[in-house]
Amino acid sequence: MIDKKYVVYYHEKVNEYFYDYYSRFNMNEQYSKPVLYSDDFELIERAKNELNERLQEQSY
């Protein structure tokens, strides 16, 4: 089984994607919705950036 070190999540209150260590991510937080788990930091960072770019494009 792959150890999932990182998580990308969408925070509804601030309308933005973030990443954090999986061990620190609070699954029970009301406004945070996980979208990707991985142990590949580069993938996590790229996914977060691309998702935020899409959000910005949709807001124009």
Regions found by a protein language model. Name each.
Residues 1-26, 60:
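Short N-terminal "domain-start" leader segments
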